[in-house]
Structure formats: structure tokens, C-alpha cells
Amino acid sequence: MRKWILTWILPSLLYRSCFHIICLVGTISLACNDMTPEQMATNVNCSSPERHTRSYDYMEGGDIRVRRLFCRTQWYLRIDKRGKVKGTQEMKNNYNIMEIRTVAVGIVAIKGVESEYYLAMNKEGKLYAKKECNEDCNFKELILENHYNTYASAKWTHSGGEMFVALNQKGVPVRGKKTKKEQKTAHFLPMAIT
């Protein structure tokens, strides 16, 4: 008779102890849940911007990146001291260094660091430069699957379609009316300054 009682009590004790351990672990995890997701990510060290080469944090606003915009047609976007927008193949040209400032989620303003002119697009889709930033200077930045970025006017469209910043095979700006997201003339790679 005693054998039967011991074998009956033993599983009961095991289940109770497992239940208490589960409750204890659950309480500890709830106590640690006071941290924000950013704090938890920092503790785990898997979501810091240093670890990701293509961080999307800049799309949230206020961030400034200094880059050279290299078009898939092998030209760097350039804004010279007179405000002329065109392409250059000289990598070490100071007029192709751009300041990309986030003004809203997914919206950026592009400014030539040396020339201090902002890139702008008018309603006909012509690229030009302005000393003062306004709505013509706002572009929707989109990261494509091929890792290139496109910059479409945030203000202007043509027949319901977006108008993109683009450089042709000769480094000449293409009017936004003639551009599409899929064209390589509108694909830019933001390159870090070395």
C-alpha cells in the first residue's frame, strides 16, 4: 500500500514544482518588461545602427547624412558653385558631396555641401538648384530591392506618375516627365565619404 502512495505523491510533487518554476520565471520576465524595445535591443546588442549597414532610422526625421549620390549610369550627381545641376565622373570632386536631410518620414532635402544649393524640381520635371529650401526641394526617398535609391519629387507629378531625379548616360539631368522608377537613370547609390 505504501508503494502506491509514494508513486502517486511523487508525480504530484513534480508537477507542483514545475508549476512554481514556471510562475517564478513568468514573474521575472514581467518585471523585466518595463524596458522599452529600444532598451531591450541595446541590451541584446542586435539592433544598434552600427551593426546594420542600411539602417532605416534616418527616415524618421531630423537625420543628416553626407553622401555622394552615384547614379547607375556611372555619374555622380553634382551641384556646382553657380547652381548648375549635372553629373561628374570625378569621385574626388567637392561639388558632388551632398547633405541628405530628412524632413519627414521618407522625405528628404538634398543640398550640395560645397555649393550650398538645394536640389529642386519644378512642375515640368526640370532639375535646378535653389539657395533657399522650399517644397520644390523635397523628394521621396525609396530604397529599391537592388539596393539603389530613387528620389521622386514630393510635390510634383506628371499624369499621375512620379517624377524622379535622373542622370542619362552623358551625365545630363533627365526631365522628371520622362523618368520611371525602373529606369537605371533614376537609380542612385548613396556612397559614404572616404
Swiss-Prot record:
<dbReference type="GO" id="GO:0008083">
    <property type="term" value="F:growth factor activity"/>
</dbReference>
<dbReference type="GO" id="GO:0005576">
    <property type="term" value="C:extracellular region"/>
</dbReference>
<keyword id="KW-0964">Secreted</keyword>
<dbReference type="Pfam" id="PF00167">
    <property type="entry name" value="FGF"/>
</dbReference>
<dbReference type="GO" id="GO:0008201">
    <property type="term" value="F:heparin binding"/>
</dbReference>
<comment type="similarity">
    <text>Belongs to the heparin-binding growth factors family.</text>
</comment>
<dbReference type="GO" id="GO:0051781">
    <property type="term" value="P:positive regulation of cell division"/>
</dbReference>
<comment type="function">
    <text>Plays an important role in the regulation of embryonic development, cell proliferation and cell differentiation. Required for normal branching morphogenesis. Growth factor active on keratinocytes. Possible major paracrine effector of normal epithelial cell proliferation.</text>
</comment>
<keyword id="KW-0497">Mitogen</keyword>
<keyword id="KW-0358">Heparin-binding</keyword>
<comment type="subunit">
    <text>Interacts with FGFBP1. Interacts with FGFR2. Affinity between fibroblast growth factors (FGFs) and their receptors is increased by heparan sulfate glycosaminoglycans that function as coreceptors.</text>
</comment>
<keyword id="KW-0732">Signal</keyword>
<feature type="glycosylation site" description="N-linked (GlcNAc...) asparagine">
    <location>
        <position position="45"/>
    </location>
</feature>
<keyword id="KW-0339">Growth factor</keyword>
<dbReference type="InterPro" id="IPR002209">
    <property type="entry name" value="Fibroblast_GF_fam"/>
</dbReference>
<keyword id="KW-0325">Glycoprotein</keyword>
<protein>
    <recommendedName>
        <fullName>Fibroblast growth factor 7</fullName>
    </recommendedName>
</protein>
<dbReference type="InterPro" id="IPR008996">
    <property type="entry name" value="IL1/FGF"/>
</dbReference>
<feature type="signal peptide">
    <location>
        <begin position="1"/>
        <end position="31"/>
    </location>
</feature>
